[in-house]
A protein has these predicted regions:
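Outer-membrane beta-barrel "beta-signal"
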Residues: 129-134, 161-175
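C-terminal beta-signal and adjacent terminal beta-strands/loops
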Residues: 93-110, 133, 141-157, 173-175
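Transmembrane beta-strands of outer-membrane beta-barrel proteins
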Residues: 8-12, 87-91, 125, 136-138, ...
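C-terminal outer-membrane beta-barrel translocator/porin domains of Gram-negative envelope proteins
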Residues: 1-80, 89-112, 153
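Outer-membrane beta-barrel strand-turn architecture
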Residues: 1-4, 79-83, 130-133, 175
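Strand-loop-strand
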Residues: 103-131
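Transmembrane beta-barrel architecture of outer-membrane proteins
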Residues: 68-72, 120-124, 164-168
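Residue-level signature of outer-membrane beta-barrel architecture
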Residues: 16, 77-79, 129-131, 140-142, ...
Length: 175
């Protein structure tokens, strides 16, 4: 917390899932995904990664956009405006990768010598309605760096609002 009205939130998250026993791959529900309201907010849910894999964003494509390794970093500045309304400005970075090289996910395998080139960057603004016992978040994220193969990587240099933005509505309820 900076003062009564302003604060900075920082989050680093990561994980690795390794199949064991007679499994060659993690079950679908245990695999990581990236993009969405609690991830890299410049992408819609399950549309980022793995690695430099460039999915076609079709309805069935989300199955291929999951991985075994996840790394994400979020930095957010929050300020109280009035009543219960807060403004947030954020920067997100991260991606997912696979442990093995899969034919259906070209460019998705984690490689120590190049993974840093596949870390996506996003930025944006959000409005929060803080009702103490729950929070409503409305975030608009924009892609800054898109690691997908065949893309203009620095999206911030040639923004296309429809292609490079994502809107997220979230209800945060403490348990």
């Amino acid at each position: 917390m900076i003062d009564e009205r302003n604060s900075i939130a920082f989050h680093v998250g990561g994980g690795i899932g390794i199949p064991y026993g007679n499994s060659d791959i993690l079950p679908f529900e245990k695999r990581y995904y990236s993009g969405g309201a609690n991830s890299v907010r410049g992408w819609s849910v399950r549309t980022l990664g793995p690695g430099s894999y460039n999915g076609n964003n079709s309805v069935s494509e989300f199955i291929n956009q999951c991985g075994d390794i996840r790394l994400e970093i979020n930095l957010e500045y929050r300020t109280k405006l009035f009543w219960k309304v807060e403004l947030g400005a954020f920067i997100d970075a991260g991606n997912i990768w696979t442990i093995r090289d899969y034919e259906s996910q070209p460019g998705g395998q984690f490689r120590l010598d190049s993974f840093y080139k596949e870390i996506a960057l996003a930025y944006g603004l959000g409005i929060r309605l803080d009702f103490s016992y729950f929070l409503l978040r409305f975030d608009m994220g924009m892609k800054a760096y898109n690691p997908a193969a065949g893309q203009d990587h620095w999206a911030i240099a040639s923004q296309n609002f429809k292609r490079d933005s994502a809107f997220h509505f979230t209800v945060v309820y403490p348990f």
